[in-house]
């Protein structure tokens, strides 16, 4: 009878376990003893209370009167990537008072660069900008999106942040091991609201793959452009997350100098 040796598989199992322990050790080293900051200053802020004096509000009222609409709120589906992108860009360029952006992921790529440049331009002309971003994907190159927080008139908060080194994917992964219950509570909301009058909600995050610009593959998503009082309800959900204790101002997590060092490395 043919006998099969069990020594080789056993040796491989030992090597696999040893490699895993090494990886865990490296991960813990990269994570270090860092924790979330305490006694963080989170000034409470709310959506624009009275949007009636803005150009967008006037436009909505004119469109409503022309259409003889019976319902105070209106909706338009944005099924195409180009319509989804140009609509967001138009909201930024038309905003006079406030912009509120809430996303699960914002990628630092060509599509987002142009959009965020417009957001910065809006802040420079006096628009109050609030950006709320889930922290799971804000590592490596995408961490540079957090530089928005250091632009005047822009406030940026990270929801439910991880504690691992932001320039290490492995460190970030291992930071979740000891606090998995909290770490799996991610913020998948996606809102883009201008002057508390017009808002976009749907499946798209911000990045090339959501706007048909990724050569490797693109997501097929659907958005809704909403107008009228329903937008104020969207803003209420934004405010609830924005003022939540799990929303940390970027400045409490990382400095501008650290972001620049990451970019240079």
Regions found by a protein language model. Give the residues of each.
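N-terminal localization/anchoring segments of enzymes in phospholipid and broader phosphate metabolism
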Residues: 2-265
